[in-house]
Amino acid sequence: MKIGVLGVQGDVREHVEALHKLGVETLIVKLPEQLDMVDGLILPGGESTTMIRILKEMDMDEKLVERINNGLPVFATCAGVILLAKRIENYSQEKLGVLDITVERNAYGRQVESFETFVEIPAVGKDPFRAIFIRAPRIVETGKNVEILATYDYDPVLVKEGNILACTFHPELTDDLRLHRYFLEMVK
């Protein structure tokens, strides 16, 4: 099994390190043709407008949508969730539009208002998961086929739709590998 981490911008290294701790072969994906070399893909946190601009400049956006629509398992964190969303509230931004959610960018505040909390994620075990929110998006609406796996303050923060796992916080910034392990089970 080889897992790609989209390497255009953001928390690339942190996701690669988490995967290495789990003994998984990784590929930092920087070219459209590399999307065919991976069994699953992580879209890291970062800056979503920069990420989509780079994807378009590299002609990778359409290939990525095609691969996701054909079943490529994807794990998106923070800005990656914005990239995948079908709708972005109060903001005009290009997106991939493959996940049936509406998001609000930077909903929990600016960088200085970043915070940590614990969330319950029954799908990965009974122990609470340390969730780090940094300029995180808020999922304000989910489609009928979107499964909510975790919430914070009544808002979904971890959702799954088919082959897509989307997390508004940053699990790669913790030592807890349960969400990465959960994604690997989706890939198998």
From Swiss-Prot:
Q: Which GO terms describe its biological process?
A: glutamine catabolic process; pyridoxal phosphate biosynthetic process; pyridoxine metabolic process
Keywords on this record?
Answer: Glutamine amidotransferase, Hydrolase, Lyase, Pyridoxal phosphate
Q: Which InterPro entries match?
A: Class_I_gatase-like (IPR029062), PdxT/SNO (IPR002161), PdxT/SNO_CS (IPR021196)
Residues the record marks as active site: C78 (nucleophile), H170 (charge relay system), E172 (charge relay system)
Report the pathway entry: Cofactor biosynthesis; pyridoxal 5'-phosphate biosynthesis
User: CDD domains, from UniProt?
Assistant: GATase1_PB
Q: Name one GO cellular component term.
A: cytosol
* Coiled coil region boundaries: none
GO MF, one annotated term: pyridoxal 5'-phosphate synthase (glutamine hydrolysing) activity
The UniProt record gives the binding positions of L-glutamine as G46, E47, S48, R105, I134, R135
One Pfam match: SNO
| Entry's EC annotation | 4.3.3.6, 3.5.1.2
Q: Could you confirm whether the keyword Lyase appears in this record?
A: yes
> Assembly and interactions?
In the presence of PdxS, forms a dodecamer of heterodimers. Only shows activity in the heterodimer.
The job of this chain, per UniProt, is described as: Catalyzes the hydrolysis of glutamine to glutamate and ammonia as part of the biosynthesis of pyridoxal 5'-phosphate. The resulting ammonia molecule is channeled to the active site of PdxS.
Q: Which family does it belong to?
A: Belongs to the glutaminase PdxT/SNO family.
Name of the protein in its database record: Pyridoxal 5'-phosphate synthase subunit PdxT
Origin organism is Thermotoga sp. (strain RQ2)
Gene name in the database record: pdxT
